[in-house]
Each structure stands twice: as C-alpha cells, then as structure tokens.
C-alpha cells in the first residue's frame, strides 16, 4: 500500500518505520522544520556566548517502555549509549524518600520500601499491604476512581513521598484528579514488566544526549535509506476520501495515518467530508495540561542526576535534574513543573525562590512551556479510537490505549494504527 503519515513526532516516526517494515510505500509529512514533535531538541545560548543543544522539556523513560526501546534499536540507536539508567529513585534533597536497589523485580521494590528514609514502619506496612492487594486484583480497579481515592487509606508520608510525585510524573495529572486505572497499569508494567536485557522494567532512563539523537535523527536516516519519502516543512492542508483511495493535498494514497496533534487531526477529519462525529466528539472533549521546564545556571552539582521536590503553589517544580550528569555543562539544572499554569516570569521567580529554600542560588536561563503537553488523564475518560474510517487511522498518545500521554503511549498507538491498516489490507486482498 501507499501510506501517508501526517506528523513527524514520535508517533509519526514510529508509524512510518512500522509501515516500511510491513512493506508499505511511505510518505511522511512534517509541518515544522524539525522532527520530534513535543520531544525535540532546541539550542540554548549561555550568558558566556556558548550554544548548548538541550531539549524542549525534560523527558523520562522507564525500562518498561519496551516498544520505544525496540524502535530505537530498529533504527540503529543503542539505548545504553544515549540513556542513563538508574534504579527507580524518588529521593528528596534531604535524602528522605525511596530508592530501589539494582536487583530483579519484585525484590527491588520490597527492599526499597523496607529501607525508605523518612517513613515509619507503619508507613511501610501500609504501602506493602496496598501493593499486595493491588497485585491480587490484577492491578485493576473501577474506572471511576481517582488515584487519591484508590490510596485514601495510605499513610500521608507514602502519599506525599511516593504516590503524588509518581502520579504527576507518569500521568501529568494530580492524584485527586488522575485515573486510578491508568496509574495501576503503569505500576504493573513498571514493577512486574519483563526486563529489557539487564535493565529492569522500573529503571529510570534519562536521556544523556539531546532528544534528537535519542530517536528522530536516526529514524529519519533509517526511513530515507529504506526509500521512504520524507517531507519536512510540509503541512497537509486537506485529506479527502475518493472511492477506495485517499487524497492528501490531491495526491492519492491507499491509507492515511494521522500522527499529528489531536487539534490538527480534528481539523483534517472535520473537513474530510466523512462520517466521524463520534471520533471528533471524543477528540474534542479532551482537556490538556501543560508541562514547564525551567533551565537555570549557577546550581550545585547534585549527588544524583535527579531529585524529587516537595511541591506546592509557591514551589511549582516536582523534580530537578542535574544536566551536568546528563551530558550538559556544569551548573545547569532543569526544573520540571508538571500540570503547571501561570506565566513564565512568575514561574521562573517561584523556581528561584524554591531553589533558595534549598540553599541554592540559581539564575533563570530559559523556560520552555508545552501548553498542550499531555491530555488530562482523568477517570472514565473516553479517548478517540484508532479507527476513524476505512483507510484512515489515528496515531498519537491521546488515542485510546492503556497508557497515559507518554513516549511509549505514542509509539504503541502508532504501531497499533499500522497493524490495523495492514490487517484491513490483507482482508481486502
């Protein structure tokens, strides 16, 4: 089949690679001048005139991201060369919190809970009892529950030191608003997922090169070597059904994968003259949350690449990353405020004060705000389906699936979309 993939973010790249591997002739359209979507590189100018390539936001992968890691290997990227691995660690600057040892699951989680600092034995037993109950239920629960409701019997120290930061990191949604079902799915895969070689499913994987080198650059090079038509700066204006084919800006294709942002997909589907009311309604009902990354200079070298922070309205960042341990210059810190709001100047001022309360003096360098970073992962959410119309599918982290808006969610959605097209093609044949 001739397949058009609209969008060159991680979902679009995954869809294009999967389609080529399935034997299809692929044309990839990317509207901007850069591939990677919301996980892309950017250049930062330092006060001394140096240019440093960083990212539009600090991303975290985990060892359970099997499809993302597999995609990287397919296009020639060795994850061990571009990702810094460390066992799951949610430690605060005062050293309280949990840090798992580099052991097989579930021994790592058990020991991490037993040795968590700042927790009483009652706190630890509370978490162990809840974890055992969740496992007995297959990490499933009523779809109407929030994470806060699911964990209402947990001790406050565990909620504040583990559940709340883990929830906002994974779902970008506060615990009192976040879907317990999706949260449990992430926990299940992280705690009991299959290891990736020597990497445990719960391991944190932090990029130590810019995001362009983690996947997009290699994926584009691979696609071009395999004969795909890669078009950059090519915003698709319209798609149209024409009998058994689809016209993409007048060019005929057998199938189309919409791997662009949901707003762009809605624009194209809404003007395509097809019956897609339910899909459009679901896509249009999604609410979105921002993620802000404040880059600062002058910070100390941290004991570990990543620290968890106690966050409130005056201390917006939930995590801080020492970029000097991840391939960046000394003193560069990345402060991540998930589910953030407010203007950039106010956010920067709050982060500077948050750092001062830790005894650190920092200066803002640049703040990147992705206003539509993720959908709000709330209970009972009805996400749009992969299938839109015969020969037309959607791929993206917002599409129906078990994961929240993550890189793994985007890759899995893309692969599912291409599988659906290939299956339909075989049936038609």
What residue ranges belong to the model's regions?
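Conserved flavin/dinucleotide-binding core of flavoenzymes
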Residues: 43, 103-104, 318-429
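Glycine-rich FAD pyrophosphate-binding loop
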Residues: 20-45
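Conserved FAD-binding subdomain of flavin-dependent enzymes
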Residues: 38-41, 47-83
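Helical element adjacent to the flavin cofactor pocket in flavoenzyme catalytic cores
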Residues: 188-246, 252-255
């Amino acid at each position: 089949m001739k397949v058009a993939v609209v969008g060159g973010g991680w979902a679009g790249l995954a869809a294009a690679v999967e389609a080529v591997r399935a034997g299809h002739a692929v044309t990839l359209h990317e509207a901007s001048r850069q591939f990677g979507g919301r996980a892309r590189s950017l250049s930062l100018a330092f006060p001394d005139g140096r240019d440093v390539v960083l990212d539009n936001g600090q991303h975290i992968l985990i060892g359970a991201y099997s499809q993302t890691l597999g995609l990287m290997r397919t296009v020639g990227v060795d994850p061990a060369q571009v990702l810094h691995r460390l066992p799951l660690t949610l430690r605060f600057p005062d050293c309280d919190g949990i840090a798992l040892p580099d052991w097989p699951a579930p021994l790592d989680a058990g020991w991490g809970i037993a040795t968590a600092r700042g927790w009483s034995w009652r706190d630890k037993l509370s978490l162990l009892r809840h974890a055992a109950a969740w496992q007995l239920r297959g990490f499933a629960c009523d779809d109407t529950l929030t994470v806060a409701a699911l964990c209402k019997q947990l001790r406050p120290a565990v909620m504040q030191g583990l559940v709340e930061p883990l929830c906002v990191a994974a779902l970008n949604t506060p615990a009192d608003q976040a879907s317990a079902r999706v949260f449990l799915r992430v926990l299940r895969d992280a705690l009991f997922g299959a290891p990736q070689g020597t990497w445990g499913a719960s391991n944190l994987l932090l990029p130590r090169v810019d995001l362009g080198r983690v996947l997009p650059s290699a994926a584009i090079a691979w696609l071009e070597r395999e004969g795909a038509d890669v078009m950059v700066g090519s915003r698709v204006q319209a798609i149209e059904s024409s009998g058994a084919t689809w016209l993409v800006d007048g060019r005929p294709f057998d199938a189309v994968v919409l791997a662009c942002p949901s707003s762009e997909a809605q624009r194209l589907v809404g003007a395509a003259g097809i019956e897609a009311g339910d899909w459009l309604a679901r896509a249009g009902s999604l609410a979105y949350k921002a993620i802000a990354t404040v880059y600062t200079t002058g910070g100390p070298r941290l004991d570990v690449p990543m620290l968890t922070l106690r966050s409130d309205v005056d201390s917006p960042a939930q995590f801080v990353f020492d970029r000097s341990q991840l391939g960046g210059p000394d003193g560069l810190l990345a402060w991540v405020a998930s589910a953030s709001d407010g203007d950039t100047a106010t956010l920067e001022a709050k982060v500077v004060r948050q750092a001062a309360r830790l005894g650190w003096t920092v200066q803002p360098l640049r703040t990147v705000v992705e206003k539509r970073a993720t959908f709000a992962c709330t209970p009972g959410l009805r996400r749009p389906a992969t299938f839109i119309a015969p020969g037309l599918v959607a791929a993206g982290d917002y599409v129906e699936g078990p994961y929240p808006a993550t890189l793994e969610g985007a890759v899995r959605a893309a692969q599912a979309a291409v599988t659906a097209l290939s299956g339909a093609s075989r049936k038609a044949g």
